[in-house]
Amino acid sequence: RRWPSMGNRWLASIASRNGRERVELVDLRNGQPVPLPGINQADAQPISVSVSADGNRIALIRSREGRTELALYRRSVGILQRLPLEPAGVPREVSLDGSGRLLAVQVSRQGRWDVDLIRLP
């Protein structure tokens, strides 16, 4: 496992399973993985992951079809939504605050690193 992120009773990480890396969420009360339908896709490789305190939102950076992209997964509805970066850049690391409403993203633009703060609805 790598890129651990904790939110109250939740542990999100990137785990290797059957030769593939995938996002995994564990309920720390019982140590059991929680189903995440739609978050792990065959054509995508997770790079960084972060979970909100209530475990409902998971922010991730993944490589897909030669592009690196930022996405937000809402567990309550099972939806993975791509989040655009403005101005455009290559995301590398992500950190979601406890409320799941503010996202910090390390981004490379023209060879320079920066941190973007993104407010989420």
Task: For each feature predicted by the language model, list its residue ranges.
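Beta-strand C-termini and the immediately following turn/loop, strongest in propeller blades
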Residues: 13-18, 59-65, 104-110
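Surface loop/turn motifs at the tips and blade-to-blade linkers of beta-strand repeat domains
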Residues: 37-43, 84-88
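Blade-level signature of beta-propeller repeat domains, shared across WD40, Kelch, NHL, RCC1
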Residues: 95-121
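Short coil/turn segments that connect the beta-strands within blades of beta-propeller domains
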Residues: 8-9, 54-56, 99-101
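Beta-strand-rich domains and repeat architectures in extracellular enzymes and scaffolds
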Residues: 1-16
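Short loop/turn segments that connect beta-strands within beta-propeller blades
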Residues: 27-31, 74-78, 120-121
